[in-house]
Amino acid sequence: MAGTSSAKTRFALLPGHDEEICMPSDAPAWSLHSQLKKDTIDIGDLPLCRVLVIKDANFPWLLLVPRRNEAVEIIDLDEVEQAQLMTEISRVARALKEVTRCDKLNIAALGNLVPQLHLHVIARRSSDVAWPRPVWGVMPALAHDAEEVQNFISALRRKIWLG
């Protein structure tokens, strides 16, 4: 039914998946929260999430942000989107672990300061400055070396999108 809120636009999932993610065709354009925009570098889009690198060289730190304006909590996504989110978390976390050869992955959805749903995927090493504590507030953000961060992003893109 064209023109009604029940009209849907279909987005294909990751290759090999038969399910689809639907979003109302009259949904407003998605936008990234201004704080996340300021603090990150865009890597690219998966079917549901934008993948970003946090601008802090202290830790290999990624964000996944579902492209749903209304989502503040994971429970704000429908069941198909929640399943897709888990698929994308796994794919990105696996890539991060392979690229960094980290000891541990920290995965969290906090959102106390930024109300847009986003998930942190952080590679941790027992030798990092915050180990074993959480990374928040331990050290001031350290700017990335431009060449190093581009190499990191290229390696992540190969692992995430090419496997």
Question: Language-model features: where?
Answer:
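A cross-taxon signal for low-complexity, glycine/charged-rich
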Residues: 1-3, 7, 16-18
